[in-house]
């Protein structure tokens, strides 16, 4: 995750893609509810009408297998309507021209037979996400454990970069683990090869920081031994 779970509730737009937070991660679902209560727009894209879809401002029941076409069409709208963060693109991305040539072909109209989503709804989703002061993307196993998994994750990351929703508070690309116990264990550093926050054992400054916080002289500089 590029941003912390706590930051979700202070974003202006929550874009949920292939992820049922209320079932898999109730704590994350609670943060989404808090964000909604504070006025954030909530967008849910999922073939199933999941629990969070009940509070969503927009629910898009996109067809199975249409993830990449849907996201490319979103980015097509953002570019055609000039909603991209060009400064962020110029300073922090590469190969933008080739990317633009790719998504030009994915209009809301040309992808409707793939996604099953009306063009005007797709445009509304793109505008809502792109115009938000801050926006966070959440996705889960519904995206990753799928034959388009890699391509979909790349498209979601491209969407965040296209709108400058990286590298600042309350934004980001935030893939979650399969279940809440796994998420908590990993975030808290209960892994053999990372410290809390996925920080590296190999960095002396990080090691010193945790040694001081835990009140010990030092901690090992090498990862532990995995079970497998």
Predicted regions mapped to residue ranges:
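Cofactor-pocket helix-loop regions in the catalytic cores of large enzyme subunits
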Residues: 1-181, 188, 203-228
């Amino acid at each position: 995750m590029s941003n912390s779970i706590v930051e979700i509730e202070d974003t202006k737009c929550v874009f949920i893609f292939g992820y049922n937070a209320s079932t898999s991660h109730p704590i994350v679902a609670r943060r989404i509810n808090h964000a909604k209560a504070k006025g954030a727009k909530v967008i849910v894209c999922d073939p199933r009408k999941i629990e969070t879809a009940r509070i969503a401002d927009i629910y898009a029941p996109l067809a199975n297998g249409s993830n990449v076409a849907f996201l490319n069409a979103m980015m097509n709208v953002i570019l055609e309507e000039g909603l991209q963060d060009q400064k962020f693109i110029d300073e922090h991305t590469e190969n933008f021209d080739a990317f633009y040539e790719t998504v030009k072909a994915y209009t809301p109209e040309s992808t409707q037979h793939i996604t099953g989503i009306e063009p005007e709804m797709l445009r509304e989703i793109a505008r809502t996400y792109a115009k938000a002061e801050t926006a966070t993307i959440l996705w889960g196993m519904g995206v990753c454990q799928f034959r388009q998994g890699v391509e979909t994750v790349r498209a979601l990351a491209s969407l965040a970069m296209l709108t400058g929703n990286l590298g600042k508070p309350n934004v980001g690309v935030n893939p979650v683990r399969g279940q809440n116990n796994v998420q908590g264990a990993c975030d808290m550093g209960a892994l053999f090869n990372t410290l809390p926050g996925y920080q590296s054992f190999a960095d002396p400054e990080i090691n010193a920081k945790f040694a001081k916080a835990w009140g010990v002289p030092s901690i090992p500089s090498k990862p532990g031994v995995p079970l497998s």
